Amino acid sequence: MAAVALTYMIPPATPLAIIDFDMLPEDDESEEVGFEYEDLLDWQLKEAVDRRDLESFTILIEENWCHDLTLENGDNLLGYMIKQGHALTEEWYDLIGVTTTCHANPEGELPIDLLRKHLGSCRCNLESMNCDLVEYIIRTCYAHPINRDYVYHRMDTSRYTHKRLNRNHNLTLSIEKKPIIVEAPPMEEEEISEVEDALNVLQRLCAQEEGDNKEAETNNNNYVFPWMTPAYELPEQLTFYDMPMTPFNCNNVMYC
């Protein structure tokens, strides 16, 4: 039995192999062997992230998409990817966005609770938060088939910066402002509310992280995401192209 345990402890070859249930020990042997299916899958997923092995990561995610992506230490896979994410590209987050949405929302509903769980697992630091993560959050917020094309726009990572932008010293993400006009079906009021709630969670986390040592000089903690704000709600101190402004629940003008 010790030999079996040693076999499971050997780091898998690249690409990582899909786990064969038939090869795993029975329940009454799992304690002695020391590995259960989910433990091994978690370990393989983390290994793929650590090694930047997108091919293995893709195979593991696609073949084991029903796994809840919660690691054994209580962290979730997205949280782990964020910590290791300085070299991850959009393909990594795109895989997670697809699988978590399918798993948590088989009917294609907005995965708001899932998003809150992910956001609650990490403290967003604007100094290190990469653009892939921002894109993932936008994709996840609007994962409903009706709304995905409604708001998503490929952001230019070379222009992803953060700086103090307005006279109130509110910390604001600044991305080259490009007018986006998208034809889309109206959003239901409930959908709008859910999306706004999810974005508020992210905004509070960001404001809290960056505002801890700036509270004295900051008039308020409102956090502005210019590319997510309908044109008619943009702060006066932000100037954009002269575009028609329409209500949120019809054909919108969105900015990135």
UniProtKB/Swiss-Prot annotation:
It comes from the Viruses. Keywords: Coiled coil. Residues 187-223 form a coiled coil. This is Uncharacterized protein ORF116. It comes from Ostreid herpesvirus 1 (isolate France). The lineage of its organism: Viruses, Duplodnaviria, Heunggongvirae, Peploviricota, Herviviricetes.
